[in-house]
């Protein structure tokens, strides 16, 4: 069973949580895109919801599927956000931001009554950190901020390197908000809360990809005997 099949299985389970009239946060990334695709099918069948996208890519996909959209200013309180994750641990702490949408993803998730993560079960880890931690930064004073982020990482008991994320042409990747991304390749994060606090203390940091105390549940899909087996961390209610 392929990765797309597992993503679709997790997304299908999340779709069961959607009720008519809901205000939904729509995540970013391949697994979130699978959910948006299924949501579009339900909308075409008559489901009435409004979605708030977390990126321009998600906005474009949702619009192409006929999903009614609003901005977060128009719908500042959401019922549910469905989004993917790069890593999730047993305490529902996440690393997100591989798709460079972490700032909007976190804003939307925190404006929601509930956030549910959907992912391939391979994203479930004992300790966060194998996936590079994205840190969104202001372009102004980039070198100074880069050095300060490296110091913050070391001060939080982590080791590794911090690299500016680049596009294929070698130029810095620019987020939808006009910021850059520093990827902290740490291997393991012994204390995510300490690292999050240390990164927040750096003036040039706009947001980091540690989502702590935000997710209510994670729907994880794994291949078993040629079928998708879906399990849940946390509570879906």
UniProtKB/Swiss-Prot annotation:
Key words, A-Z: Isomerase
GO annotation (BP), single: pentose-phosphate shunt, non-oxidative branch
Annotated catalysed reactions: aldehydo-D-ribose 5-phosphate = D-ribulose 5-phosphate
Pfam families in alphabetical order: Rib_5-P_isom_A
SUPFAM superfamilies named in the record: D-ribose-5-phosphate isomerase (RpiA), lid domain (SSF75445), NagB/RpiA/CoA transferase-like (SSF100950)
EC numbers, comma separated: 5.3.1.6
Keyword DNA-binding: no
Catalytic-site annotation from UniProt: 105 (proton acceptor)
InterPro entries assigned to the protein according to its UniProt record, in alphabetical order: NagB/RpiA_transferase-like, Ribose-5P_isomerase, Ribose5P_isomerase_typA_subgr, Ribose5P_isomerase_type_A
Enzyme class name: isomerase
Binding site for substrate: 28-31, 83-86, 96-99, 123
GO molecular-function term, one example from the UniProt record: ribose-5-phosphate isomerase activity
Pathway, per record: Carbohydrate degradation; pentose phosphate pathway; D-ribose 5-phosphate from D-ribulose 5-phosphate (non-oxidative stage): step 1/1
UniProt family annotation: Belongs to the ribose 5-phosphate isomerase family.
Function: Catalyzes the reversible conversion of ribose-5-phosphate to ribulose 5-phosphate.
Complex and partners: Homodimer.
The protein's name in its UniProt record: Ribose-5-phosphate isomerase A
Gene that encodes it: rpiA
